[in-house]
């Protein structure tokens, strides 16, 4: 008989090892008393968010509740959760949905909502590019292979008949911080990314080359949503970056903080309480973190049974879940 633990690991490894995520070799971490939170590579949006979240939550708690752990991103985070080498992890929305769809086999539960990640392509301000298709045959930076951004790119481009590896000169990097530099230096014509406050977009937009942002064509959005039900229609808000002068319709998903289901309710409740209490500080420190709230966690959850009991207790206390 296959144990639940074995089944859980098999499910998460299958998701993490999918071609879209290109799993890299796992890191080795020593066990620590604080909760270990998997983030991403240096310069990545998840790294910035995770470090900001940990500082705010720990300050509110008056102790070190959580420590951010650098990883290769979503794919590695899923594997490390499955192996028990992380307690919590930042997971790109569609990968999170796939893992949660496995229910008990995944061994994961939602601990808190992060923020939505509308997918976009950035090009230098002077570029003639107006559509994704205009970059066919040109070098485009898609990010770290194991990141959720690459998974999102494959889903979005694939649904409109484009293969990121066949139709473009796909550029993958070892560290997220390298991505905008490839465009700034003229080595690539475009940069794929997602969300408000993403460091790669901020770096390109602030450079002398500037940035202009593109989403799918309006008629392409329904095709993408039909192909990938885990994605939703959303808009990148005007002013999120210099060069984004109007709301940009696109598609994306809610990124989530997932945790192992075998974590005690007490530990998770302590973390959730600290994050909830730090909501104002998080919003002031990072624009996208304004969406990291208890109310958004309740809204972003597909089913109450998928919420970790520790977080569920907080949400019930706040009348955001039925008692």
Report the location of each language-model feature.
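N-terminal secretory signal peptides and thylakoid transit peptides that target proteins
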Residues: 2-19
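C-terminal segment of N-terminal export signals and the immediately downstream linker at the start
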Residues: 5, 25-38
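Extracytoplasmic
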Residues: 32, 83, 116-118, 252-254
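Bilobed "Venus flytrap"/periplasmic-binding protein-like clamshell domains
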Residues: 34-60, 64-65, 117-185, 297, ...
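Pocket-lining segment of extracytoplasmic ligand-binding domains
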Residues: 93-95, 103, 127, 164-263
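Short beta-strand-centered segments that line the small-molecule binding cleft or hinge
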Residues: 107-115
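Ligand-binding clefts/hinges and TM-proximal coupling segments of bilobed small-molecule sensing domains
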Residues: 145-156, 231-300
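An extracytoplasmic/periplasmic, membrane-proximal ligand-sensing/linker region
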Residues: 178, 184-186, 195-213, 223-226, ...
């Amino acid at each position: 008989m296959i144990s639940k633990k074995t089944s859980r690991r098999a499910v998460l490894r299958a998701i993490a090892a999918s071609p879209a995520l290109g799993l890299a070799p796992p890191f080795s971490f020593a066990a620590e008393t604080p909760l270990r939170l998997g983030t991403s590579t240096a310069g990545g949006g998840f790294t910035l968010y995770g470090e900001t979240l940990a500082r705010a939550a720990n300050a509110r708690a008056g102790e070190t509740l959580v420590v951010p752990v650098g990883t290769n991103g979503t794919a590695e985070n899923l594997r490390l959760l499955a192996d028990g080498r992380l307690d919590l992890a930042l997971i790109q929305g569609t990968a999170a949905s796939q893992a949660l769809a496995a229910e008990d086999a995944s061994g994961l539960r939602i601990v808190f909502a992060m923020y939505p990640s509308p997918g976009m392509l950035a090009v230098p301000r002077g570029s003639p590019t107006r559509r994704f298709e205009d970059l066919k045959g040109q070098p485009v930076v898609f990010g770290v292979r194991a990141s959720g951004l690459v998974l999102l790119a494959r889903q979005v481009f694939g649904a409109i008949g484009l293969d990121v590896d066949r139709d473009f000169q796909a550029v993958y990097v070892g560290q997220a911080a390298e991505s905008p530099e490839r465009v700034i230096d003229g080595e690539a014509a475009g940069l794929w990314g997602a969300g408000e406050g993403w460091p790669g977009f901020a770096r390109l937009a602030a450079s002398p080359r500037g940035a202009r942002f593109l989403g799918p064509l309006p008629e392409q959005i329904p095709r993408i949503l039909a192909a990938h039900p885990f994605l939703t229609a959303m808009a990148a808000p005007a002013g999120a970056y210099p060069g984004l002068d109007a709301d940009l319709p696109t598609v994306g998903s809610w990124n989530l903080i997932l945790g192992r289901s075998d974590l005690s309710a007490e530990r998770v409740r302590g973390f959730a309480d600290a994050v909830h209490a730090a909501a104002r500080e998080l919003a002031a420190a990072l624009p996208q973190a304004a969406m990291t709230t208890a109310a958004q966690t309740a809204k972003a959850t597909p089913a109450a049974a998928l919420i970790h009991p520790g977080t569920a207790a907080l949400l019930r206390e706040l009348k955001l879940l039925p008692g």
